Curated annotation (Swiss-Prot):
This is Thymidylate kinase. Gene3D superfamilies: P-loop containing nucleotide triphosphate hydrolases. It comes from Kosmotoga olearia (strain ATCC BAA-1733 / DSM 21960 / TBF 19.5.1). Belongs to the thymidylate kinase family. It is an enzyme of class 2 (transferase). Its EC number is 2.7.4.9. Pfam families: Thymidylate_kin. Keywords: ATP-binding, Kinase, Nucleotide biosynthesis, Nucleotide-binding, Transferase. Disulfide bonds: none annotated.
Amino acid sequence: MFISFEGIDGSGKSTQVALFREYLERNSMEYVFIREPGGTQAGEDIREILLHNEYKLFPETELLLFMASRAQIVREVIIPALKKKKLVLADRFLDSSVAYQGYGRGLSIQMVTTLNEFSTGGVTPHLTLFIDVPVDVAVKRMRREMKHDKIEMESLDFFKRVRQGYLELAKRDPKRILVIDGTMSVEKIHEQVVKEFLLCLKKLGHGL
């Protein structure tokens, strides 16, 4: 099974990923964890360029770097893990590119989608959990943190476009992408995450 978590920066996504990993470990469920960009040696080098180096990247350059990282991790990590029937847990995957580079940066949605198909080789999560919060809430959370990468320092309008992109994706693919209210308590969100995970496991014919 392949499950991904999505959300705009400041949504609480990373907190929920951490809680879900703890849940899996408590229940002795083996899993492979990946994050985007990164997850491989090549991917981590690309992550450094994308998020922390002082390069002035054009949107097209940024998109292709994300795709390069994704192509590597799909073939090096995800496909081998799925072939071994392992659970794969991703902190961001292909939907991030559509939301951030497509809707956020204004690149062609069709082009981003085509590049996603090429970079993933058609590998798609069985379940994607989108932790949704209003942009003003997310920005307040980010401002409370001391460290910000280049993407987290984008404008309010940028994150509004990204959030709208995620919501559009969820409308188009409601069976895979589930929207979770990120303004609920951390505990309530985690409960819903686990509930949706177990339902998906059941649909796929797996048990805990």
